[in-house]
């Protein structure tokens, strides 16, 4: 029996429908197998106010330019201090952290953070200090006994205070620490609600110039070298070497530019920080901005810091600072 015209039409329609579904399925598989050219990956960068080099790179859009050929976009996330920044890396909120003080990775490691060192800034011992009011009777480190001192927990200034107390034969039991983020520490200090404040630049220089505070001690004379480190999530560092190489190169380049062009750098940062250019230039003079590769030998002070905090029972567990991964650039 010869099929009717309507039957042929239905059969043809059914065949075309099946072929259409097949074409769509193949197209979908192709899309899944081949990344879209415009589907850029996002690198989430955390930074703080003292992250000078990253602040400049963010402002001029340099990282976006050099990472675009790798198919990477950038999102920026500001933190009040280093410890919450590294905590954000550990929980997966950001991928890369701009420079934090040497003490910060030690505390993060004690909390189980899986991080990788990416770069270091050479020592800048005068870029953090213990401040007292100009008229304060506190003249020596021994005079800190019994005093209420503002300090940011886990920051480099925390170690400076510990080291300064030890030099005077004191411990944290001999003082009343007030653990405050930088902005709150400054407010407490200028309001005379604390006897001393341990701060770092640019907060340090800004407060000295504006309130006439006096430096009781900085990191010189072996108290605290104050290196700063750039870190990334360990898994990000393991899988994104090309991106980190690009960032590393820009950090080295920008650090050299800041030291070679202090007035120009201060002018740019003054607008970003809301601080006058003269103050910024003075603060920058305290920093080395010498960015280099991290080495196991160069991390020797990290263990000293960890052991000192453990002895004071500020750090809850013993930390092996050599256990953190170290990413190595192609061209140190």
What function would you assign to each model-found segment?
Residues 41-171, 178-179, 195-201, 224:
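Short, glycine-/small- and polar/acidic-enriched structural segments
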Residues 103, 177-178, 183-271:
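Pocket-lining segment of extracytoplasmic ligand-binding domains
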Residues 54, 124-130, 213-214, 226-230, ...:
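Small-molecule pocket liners
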Residues 1-16:
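N-terminal secretory signal peptides that target proteins for export/translocation
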Residues 20-31:
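Bacterial N-terminal signal peptides
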Residues 33-39:
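Sec/Tat signal peptide C-region and signal peptidase I cleavage site
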Residues 238-314:
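Secondary-structure end/capping motifs
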Residues 307-332:
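Conserved C-terminal helix/tail region of periplasmic/extracytoplasmic solute-binding proteins
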